């Protein structure tokens, strides 16, 4: 499961 922090990194 991808962490929310990783999602922010994509942004």
Swiss-Prot record:
The modification Pyrrolidone carboxylic acid is found at residue 1. Belongs to the tachykinin family. Expressed by the skin glands. Disulfide bonds: none annotated. Tachykinins are active peptides which excite neurons, evoke behavioral responses, are potent vasodilators and secretagogues, and contract (directly or indirectly) many smooth muscles. GO terms for cellular component: extracellular region. This is Kassinin-like peptide K-III. The keyword tRNA processing does not apply. It comes from the Eukaryota. The modification Methionine amide is found at residue 11. Its main location: secreted. The lineage of its organism: Eukaryota, Metazoa, Chordata, Craniata, Vertebrata. InterPro entries: Tachy_Neuro_lke_CS (IPR013055), Tachykinin_dom (IPR008215). One of its GO terms (biological process) is neuropeptide signaling pathway. Keywords: Amidation, Amphibian defense peptide, Neuropeptide, Pyrrolidone carboxylic acid, Secreted. It is found in: Secreted. The keyword Secreted applies. It comes from Pseudophryne guentheri.
């Amino acid at each position: 499961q991808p962490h929310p922090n990783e999602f922010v990194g994509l942004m």
